[in-house]
């Protein structure tokens, strides 16, 4: 078994082994010279190992052989004549064998070769080739790694195109930055290709396709919330169209515009259509006319200009309703007498003692009885005075508005004196007071009707 193994070993190794075991005096010098020769040759030696030497199983066999030979050396050492020379030669041989073994350890770690101190020199010859190839491979790996790391660095810094991952810039293919996400795109890489006009215009703020989609979605989301309460507003508007809801709103507007006493009991529609029966008239007049009477007294004390304004407003307000035909001629005749006969100027000049006199009859006007008697007197006047409006116009009638004493002259004086005697006996108000108040009320009612119609038209629109 040992002979077969010896045939496969290196001849230089066998020669050195023979010198080691020899008992001659020159063996140590020859061994040293052989070691120097082998070191000088090194890789350039003519010996080339076969594949058998490199294979791991045969390496293990050589190891077993060297293990067998070691006891032989130890046994032969005491028998030698020159022990010191042999020991030095043995040390040199071991050092020479350890040097290539150390080199092979570094190279053969990747090939799973068991580590042993004694390995052949042929393996050291094959090792530089493997080292060179590994160097070449490592250089290639480093260059590729540098390229990839540069690309990654450019991508991390945001210097390269997001689509093609390159930093190249041409005349018609420049890098454009999205102002929202700050990604760079080539003009050709971006799906809707970016035109040169968009790139060169400094005023333009460019967004990529993804950001534009997101911004559109956000805009739609922000527009939707204000659209949701819109149906609630629409649902409120049909309730306004309801006639029951209209009335309080229009009444509030009337109170604020005319600045009368704030009473929600005022129902001008019932007052207008209330002359069909005397009971309805009296009940409506007591509640509604008390506030308007005080307001009319204030306006009548201002002078004849207010009467003229009321007559003008009454003429321009619109058509009279059929249900209120009994009252309206009274107001018209009263206004005609006051405007044509110039009675307002007479009242202001001769009959009124002081400007504070018209305020005195206000407390009795608020009583319910006075309202009843006034409504009755108005009905009497309307019944009596309707056939003779022409006689009232030319006839000069002198009337006192403040003191409560009244006297009428003219062809129809006997008919109107009855009504005035009733009113003067029951209250301190004159006949002129109710007729002027009625005319003002009629004018105000017509204005209210016109305003109601205008408000209804607006709501319908």
UniProtKB/Swiss-Prot annotation:
Q: Where is the composition biased (Polar residues)?
A: 302-328
Q: Where in the cell is it found?
A: Nucleus
Give the matching CDD domains.
Answer: PHD_Int12
Main site of residence? nucleus
Q: Which residues carry this modification: Phosphoserine?
A: 127
Specify residue ranges for compositional bias: Low complexity: 348-357, 381-436
**How is it modified post-translationally?**
Dephosphorylated at Ser-127 by the PNUTS-PP1 complex, promoting RNA polymerase II transcription pause-release.
Keywords, A to Z, come to: Isopeptide bond, Metal-binding, Nucleus, Phosphoprotein, Ubl conjugation, Zinc, Zinc-finger
Q: Which Pfam families match?
A: PHD
Stretch list, region Disordered: 42-131, 302-443
Q: What processes does the entry annotate via GO biological process terms?
A: RNA polymerase II transcription initiation surveillance; snRNA processing
Output the Gene Ontology cellular-component terms: INTAC complex; integrator complex; nucleus
Specify residue ranges for compositional bias: Basic and acidic residues: 88-124
Crosslink Glycyl lysine isopeptide (Lys-Gly) (interchain with G-Cter in SUMO2): position given as 68, 253
What Gene3D superfamilies does the annotation carry?
Zinc/RING finger domain, C3HC4 (zinc finger)
- State one molecular function term (GO): zinc ion binding
Q: Which domain of life is it from?
A: Eukaryota
- Where would I find the PHD-type zinc fingers in this protein? 158-214
Family assignment from sequence similarity = Belongs to the Integrator subunit 12 family.
Q: How does it assemble?
A: Component of the Integrator complex, composed of core subunits INTS1, INTS2, INTS3, INTS4, INTS5, INTS6, INTS7, INTS8, INTS9/RC74, INTS10, INTS11/CPSF3L, INTS12, INTS13, INTS14 and INTS15. The core complex associates with protein phosphatase 2A subunits PPP2CA and PPP2R1A, to form the Integrator-PP2A (INTAC) complex.
What this protein is reported to do is described as: Component of the integrator complex, a multiprotein complex that terminates RNA polymerase II (Pol II) transcription in the promoter-proximal region of genes.
The protein here is known as Integrator complex subunit 12
Which organism does this sequence originate in? Mus musculus (Mouse)
């Amino acid at each position: 078994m040992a002979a077969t193994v010896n045939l496969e070993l290196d001849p230089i190794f066998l020669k050195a082994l023979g010198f080691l075991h020899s008992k001659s005096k020159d063996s140590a010098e020859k061994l040293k010279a052989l070691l120097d020769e082998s070191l000088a040759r090194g890789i350039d030696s003519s010996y080339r190992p076969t594949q058998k030497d490199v294979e791991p199983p045969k390496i293990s066999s050589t190891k077993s052989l060297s293990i067998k030979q070691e006891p032989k050396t130890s046994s032969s050492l005491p028998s030698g004549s020159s022990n010191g020379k042999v020991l030095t030669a043995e040390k040199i041989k071991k050092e020479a064998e350890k040097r290539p073994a150390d080199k092979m350890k570094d190279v053969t770690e990747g090939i799973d070769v068991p580590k042993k101190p004694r390995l052949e020199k042929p393996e050291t010859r094959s090792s530089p080739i493997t080292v060179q190839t590994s160097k070449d491979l490592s250089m290639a790996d480093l260059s590729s790694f540098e390229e990839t790391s540069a690309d990654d660095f450019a991508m991390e810094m945001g210097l390269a195109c997001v689509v093609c991952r390159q930093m190249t810039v041409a005349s018609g293919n420049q890098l454009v930055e999205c102002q929202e996400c700050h990604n760079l795109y080539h003009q050709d890489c971006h799906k809707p290709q970016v035109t040169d006009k968009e790139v060169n215009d400094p005023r333009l703020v460019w967004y990529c396709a993804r950001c534009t989609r997101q911004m559109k979605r956000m805009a739609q989301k922000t527009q939707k919330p204000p659209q949701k309460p819109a149906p609630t507003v629409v649902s409120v508007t049909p309730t306004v169209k309801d006639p029951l809801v209209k009335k309080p709103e229009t009444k509030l507007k009337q109170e604020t515009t005319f600045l009368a006493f704030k009473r929600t009991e005022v129902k001008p529609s019932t007052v207008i259509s209330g002359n069909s029966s005397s009971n309805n008239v009296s009940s409506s007049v007591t509640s509604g006319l008390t506030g308007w009477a005080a307001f009319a007294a204030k306006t009548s004390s201002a002078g004849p200009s207010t009467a003229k304004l009321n007559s003008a407003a009454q003429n321009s307000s619109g058509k009279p309703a059929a249900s209120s035909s009994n009252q309206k001629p009274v107001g018209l005749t009263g206004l005609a007498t006051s405007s044509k006969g110039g009675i307002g100027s007479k009242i202001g000049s001769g009959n009124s003692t002081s400007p504070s006199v018209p305020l005195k009859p206000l407390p009795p006007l608020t009583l319910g009885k006075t309202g009843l008697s006034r409504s009755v007197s108005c009905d009497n006047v309307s019944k009596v005075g309707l056939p003779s409006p022409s006689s009232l116009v030319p006839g000069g009638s002198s009337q006192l508005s403040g003191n409560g004493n009244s006297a009428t002259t003219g062809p129809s004086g006997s008919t109107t004196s009855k009504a005035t005697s009733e009113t003067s006996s029951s209250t301190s108000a004159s006949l002129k007071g109710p007729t002027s108040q009625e005319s003002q009320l009629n004018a105000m009612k017509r204005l209210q009707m016109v305003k109601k119609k205008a408000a209804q038209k607006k709501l319908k629109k």
